[in-house]
Amino acid sequence: MGVPQRRQSHARKNKRRSEWRKIDKPGLVECPQCHELKMPHRACLNCGYYKSNKVM
């Protein structure tokens, strides 16, 4: 089994650990009712429709 040959600096350690937190921005889709941008699989905040049904 491999053993570290040199001590890793704080900067390199922190840089490696920070990568897992990066999350892509969610894609936006156009609402079929009012044509505003909204998050997918959620009701439109502008008109209140979700899957062609008024929910809000």
Swiss-Prot record:
Give this protein's Gene Ontology molecular function annotations.
structural constituent of ribosome
Which residue stretches belong to region Disordered?
1-21
Q: Give the GO terms filed under biological process for this record.
A: translation
Record keywords, A-Z: Ribonucleoprotein, Ribosomal protein
Q: Does the keyword rRNA processing apply?
A: no
Q: Where is the composition biased (Basic residues)?
A: 7-19
Write down the HAMAP family for this protein, in alphabetical order: Ribosomal_bL32 (MF_00340)
Matching entries from PANTHER family are given as: 50S RIBOSOMAL PROTEIN L32 (PTHR35534), LARGE RIBOSOMAL SUBUNIT PROTEIN BL32 (PTHR35534:SF1)
Official protein name in the record: Large ribosomal subunit protein bL32
Origin species, per record, is: Syntrophomonas wolfei subsp. wolfei (strain DSM 2245B / Goettingen)
Ranked from the top, the taxonomy reads:
Bacteria, Bacillati, Bacillota, Clostridia, Eubacteriales
